[in-house]
Amino acid sequence: MAAAAAAAAGDSDSWDADAFSVEDPVRKVGGGGTAGGDRWEGEDEDEDVKDNWDDDDDEKKEEAEVKPEVKISEKKKIAEKIKEKERQQKKRQEEIKKRLEEPEEPKVLTPEEQLADKLRLKKLQEESDLELAKETFGVNNTVYGIDAMNPSSRDDFTEFGKLLKDKITQYEKSLYYASFLEVLVRDVCISLEIDDLKKITNSLTVLCSEKQKQEKQSKAKKKKKGVVPGGGLKATMKDDLADYGGYDGGYVQDYEDFM
């Protein structure tokens, strides 16, 4: 019996040992082993990458929220520019209005000069309004020819004068051309000094004298052509008949005998 009990106790101890030995590998694998630790470390890195993606999304949202603020600031700048232009335009209009109501120089002007001065100031006001509208809406028209010129030197004004002359003289056949020039010259000379006006007047006087000489010479030539030597109408008729003498010489001879 003692032997059987000892054998049974031995079997029980061996079973416990086997059970303990089986649990050890499981504990080693499930514990802090190298392979298990590496796998979890990789998963931790994946979680870090996910956090970075969230950061990118947050940055994009922040940028999207910042952009409207920039647009608002730009609109404010544009509005301020427009207000400044309006203030300048209002100031110009007040100055022009003041000049229209009260002339700066206390001088006596003829009704024509007063009208020309008012028209000139009105034109300046219209040009100022147009310029303000262009600047407000960002209009930039490309112009050529006379409108594109901005003369400053003598050569520039010479070229400008040629283009202007070609532009105006193309209407010289019009019935209203002379009266148009009269008004134009007076309007463009209204702001000149007396000495400059005298120079222009002298130049026009010389031109008028030359035109008169040419007209007299032309009339003298016409009178010479109208004089018929040797008998007036009789000689003229004789010459006309002589033109037919080549075909039949009897016409001229019969005419002389008859006379």
From Swiss-Prot:
Keywords assigned: Coiled coil, Cytoplasm, Initiation factor, Isopeptide bond, Phosphoprotein, Protein biosynthesis, Ubl conjugation
UniProt-annotated location(s): Cytoplasm
The UniProt record lists the keyword Protein biosynthesis: yes
Region (Disordered): 1-111, 218-247
PTM description: Phosphorylated. Phosphorylation is enhanced upon serum stimulation.
Composition-biased stretches (Acidic residues): 41-60
UniProt biased composition (Low complexity): 1-12
Pfam families: eIF3_subunit
Positions of post-translational Phosphoserine modification: S12, S14, S21, S128
Basic and acidic residues composition bias: residue spans: 61-107
Region (Sufficient for interaction with EIF3B): 1-70
Cross-link (Glycyl lysine isopeptide (Lys-Gly) (interchain with G-Cter in SUMO2)): K107
Location of Phosphotyrosine modifications: Y255
Function (record text): Component of the eukaryotic translation initiation factor 3 (eIF-3) complex, which is required for several steps in the initiation of protein synthesis. The eIF-3 complex associates with the 40S ribosome and facilitates the recruitment of eIF-1, eIF-1A, eIF-2:GTP:methionyl-tRNAi and eIF-5 to form the 43S pre-initiation complex (43S PIC). The eIF-3 complex stimulates mRNA recruitment to the 43S PIC and scanning of the mRNA for AUG recognition.
Similarity comment text for this entry: Belongs to the eIF-3 subunit J family.
Quaternary structure and partners: Component of the eukaryotic translation initiation factor 3 (eIF-3) complex, which is composed of 13 subunits: EIF3A, EIF3B, EIF3C, EIF3D, EIF3E, EIF3F, EIF3G, EIF3H, EIF3I, EIF3J, EIF3K, EIF3L and EIF3M. The eIF-3 complex appears to include 3 stable modules: module A is composed of EIF3A, EIF3B, EIF3G and EIF3I; module B is composed of EIF3F, EIF3H, and EIF3M; and module C is composed of EIF3C, EIF3D, EIF3E, EIF3K and EIF3L. EIF3C of module C binds EIF3B of module A and EIF3H of module B, thereby linking the three modules. EIF3J is a labile subunit that binds to the eIF-3 complex via EIF3B.
Protein name: Eukaryotic translation initiation factor 3 subunit J
Native organism taxonomy: Eukaryota, Metazoa, Chordata, Craniata, Vertebrata
